[in-house]
């Protein structure tokens, strides 16, 4: 069941990212979002089950506070984060490569460094995606008919922040 959920999540994510007709036209966009959400929630449940309940609740609280603070910052900030798409993409590739290297050097320290970098990167992505969704005076924005895709971006940012914070908390207890 895990592999089916992972496959559904990857296929729906790639379909929505690459196919404009899938992410712009109802009801297709709602169907893909629902499929993605179901698959992601199953995977998130499996992953969260590997941690203690108090650790998961602490991660939920920290994630909620971080996301609220970053969203308020994105609304109030004079800085335009929408021009940082290329830099964030390169940072994502660096994080991916660091994660692959970290597999061969397991340990508490490298796990915490990796998870901290991921939490920081997706925190910046949350600001970036929030400003992209807002449009207005920012240089770049997401068009209004792509509201499902914008919601998916925010959802992914928040889930990734949660997972990295949970990893930090889990690695800290060991």
Go through each PLM region and give its residues.
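A hydrophobic alpha-helical transmembrane-helix feature that marks the membrane cores
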Residues: 1-174
């Amino acid at each position: 069941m895990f592999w089916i959920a992972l496959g559904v999540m990857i296929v729906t994510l790639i379909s929505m990212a690459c196919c404009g007709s899938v992410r712009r036209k109802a009801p297709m966009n709602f169907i893909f979002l629902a499929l993605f959400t179901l698959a992601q929630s199953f995977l998130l449940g499996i992953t969260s089950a590997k941690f203690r309940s108090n650790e998961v609740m602490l991660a939920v609280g920290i994630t909620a506070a971080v996301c609220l603070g970053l969203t308020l910052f994105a609304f109030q900030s004079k800085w335009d984060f929408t021009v940082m798409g290329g830099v964030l993409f390169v940072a994502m590739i660096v994080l991916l490569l660091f994660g692959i290297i970290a597999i061969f050097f397991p340990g508490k320290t490298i796990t915490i460094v990796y998870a901290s970098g991921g939490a920081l990167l997706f925190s910046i992505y949350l600001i970036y995606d929030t400003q992209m969704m807002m449009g207005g005076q920012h240089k770049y924005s997401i068009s209004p008919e792509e509201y499902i895709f914008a919601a998916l971006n925010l959802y992914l940012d928040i889930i990734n922040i949660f997972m990295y914070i949970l990893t930090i908390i889990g690695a800290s207890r060991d």
